[in-house]
Design a protein with these regions (language model features):
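Conserved alpha-helix/loop element of class I SAM-dependent methyltransferases that forms part
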Residues: 17-39
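Conserved class I S-adenosyl-L-methionine
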Residues: 36-48, 113-144
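Conserved SAM-binding loop of SAM-dependent methyltransferases across substrates and taxa
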Residues: 48-60
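Adenosine-cofactor binding site in Rossmann-like domains, unifying the SAM/SAH pocket
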Residues: 63-77
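A short acidic, Gly/Pro-enriched loop at the edge of an enzyme's catalytic core
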Residues: 74-86
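A short, conserved alpha-helix within the catalytic core of class I
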Residues: 93-104
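Conserved Class I S-adenosyl-L-methionine
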Residues: 145-146, 151-215
Length: 215
């Protein structure tokens, strides 16, 4: 499972895990859009860690599945109709490929929910990473998610540092020149960080979908 939106060396990764969304807005949004409490939740590319524990703390029964087979083919390693909610955290559904949608439909029970987390951009963190499709095309009304029946909820989070000095040191170590450029503009020990949760229901939902916000 992609515990974090960015893959860093282990030491920096541990530091990043203590920085991203310390307020817990992302798991609360997953509960609001699922819900996940008291339900069978399948996390793609799963492993024990921060996100799995956050889901369990909300009352989810968490299971994991690989999103791809040994040859790289799209196949979720889970039985048909085995989950109430499927969650992808940054790693899968990079553009909502039809094969992934079909696999989500297969493993979800009627009325099941698919929640796909990606970065949204329009924030401080996006300046660290350059141009990415999740920062523009994916969230457009004509993009791969919204044109295929998804709604989007934008969650306004932060990367929060212990101090401005701590932020400057981390950003330089993790992101080199781009990090130093962002750090030079720090006025307080945090960066704005926006996350998109694309969500949809499959087959026979018994209640209306939660409202989302679209750009």
């Amino acid at each position: 499972m992609a515990e974090l939106p960015i893959d860093l060396d282990e030491g920096l990764r541990q530091r990043l895990s203590r920085i991203v969304d310390i307020e817990g807005k992302i798991p609360r949004a997953l509960e609001a859009l699922g819900p996940v409490a008291g339900r069978d939740v399948l996390v793609l590319d799963g492993a024990e860690g921060i996100r799995a524990q956050q889901l369990r703390d909300l009352g989810a029964r968490v299971a994991f599945a690989n999103a791809r087979g040994p040859a790289g083919e799209v196949v979720f390693d889970a039985p048909a109709a085995s989950a109430d909610v499927v969650i992808s955290l940054w790693s899968s559904f990079r553009g909502a490929a039809p094969e992934e949608i079909a696999e989500a439909r297969r493993v979800l029970r009627p009325g099941g929910r698919l929640l796909v987390v990606h970065d949204y951009g329009r924030d401080d963190v996006s300046h660290l990473r350059g141009a990415l499709p999740e920062y523009g095309p994916w969230s457009k009304r004509g993009g791969p998610f919204l044109r295929d029946g998804f709604k989007v909820r934008v969650v306004h989070c932060f990367w929060t540092f212990e101090s401005i000095e701590d932020g400057v040191a981390f950003l330089a170590a993790a992101f080199a020149d781009a990090g130093r450029a962002v750090a030079s503009a720090l006025k307080r020990p945090r960066l704005s960080y926006n996350v998109a949760i694309y969500h949809r229901t499959f087959d026979g939902a018994s209640a209306p979908e939660p409202s989302g916000s679209a750009p």
